[in-house]
Amino acid sequence: MESGTSRTSDTGGTGRAGSTETSGSGDIARTLELLWDTGRRPSRGPKPTLTLDRVVEAAVQIADAEGLEGLSMRRVAAELGTGTMSLYRYVPGKGELLDLMLDRVQRPSENPADLGDGGWRAALEAMARETLALYRRHPWLLQVNQSRPILGPSAMDGMEKVLTLIRPMGLTDPELVSAIIMIDGYVVGAARSQLYQQEAERRTGLTDAEFWRAQVPMLEKVLASGRYPVMASLSEDTFGPDFDHFGFGLQRILDGLEVLVAQRRGESAP
């Protein structure tokens, strides 16, 4: 998430269920050195022909196009027109590279306006929508179990920005973090659902509208039988594409937090 919170995702970027990679699976100390740029730099030898930044960018582009199943050190080397062994001068292996990729794509926006008008509710809503957009841009993120994230600059910067805006809620520190995790989990579920729909269309060749239209004749007979009176009474737009299910659910979560915030303020009032 662009706020930098931890998360666990369990679907593939190509619609395949189950995480295929785990963050923090490489050398943790070395990964942190690379993320925070604190490692020793060689003072002798030929000047490197690549940069770590180029290696990470190439890896992200491959994952965006092919999913994590298409990512390997050899594949990245081929993309950069170099030998596989030359990459190990910049990054120890695929595990560390993955954590660098996560930090790269989850870099928070530097524009303060992107987190709303400065209020906690607007900040959490903006965070949720930005995170959903992030999964759409980089669906391979849903292939990574991020329950134990490596805390690089992007994670820390993002969390700092969001916590700064939501601290006035008056909740305890664990509750503030829990609110972020709760919203992040909601976003992951929504992103997963959208990816499954895209994968179903790709595999069947039927659009969502075509799929449901094929069921209409039988459903009309079933609903006319009187067996399902409540479902038969539903309006025609009940299952239509125009209703913003994501926005509706997000607002209800924020409404619940609003109640808690008001309750805490009432408890602290003289």
Curated annotation (Swiss-Prot):
Give the subcellular location. Answer: Cytoplasm
| SUPFAM superfamilies per record | Homeodomain-like, Tetracyclin repressor-like, C-terminal domain
Q: What ranges does the record give for the region Disordered, renumbered to this chain?
A: 1-28
Keyword Iron on entry: no
- Primary location: cytoplasm
User: In the UniProt record for this chain, what is stated about the effect of gene disruption?
Assistant: The transcriptional level of drrA2-drrB2 is significantly up-regulated in the drrR1 deletion mutant compared with that in the wild-type strain.
Activity regulation: Daunorubicin and doxorubicin can induce dissociation of DrrR1 from its DNA complex. Ampicillin cannot release DrrR1 from the DNA complex at the same concentrations.
Q: What does this protein do?
A: Transcriptional regulator that modulates the expression of the drrA2-drrB2 genes, which encode an ABC transporter involved in daunorubicin efflux, in response to intracellular daunorubicin/doxorubicin accumulation. In the absence of daunorubicin or doxorubicin, binds directly to the drrA2-drrB2 promoter region and negatively regulates expression of the genes. In the presence of daunorubicin or doxorubicin, DrrR1 dissociates from DNA, leading to the transcription of the genes.
Annotated protein name in UniProt: HTH-type transcriptional repressor DrrR1
Q: Which UniProt keywords apply?
A: Cytoplasm, DNA-binding, Repressor, Transcription, Transcription regulation
Q: Start and end of every HTH tetR-type domain?
A: 49-109
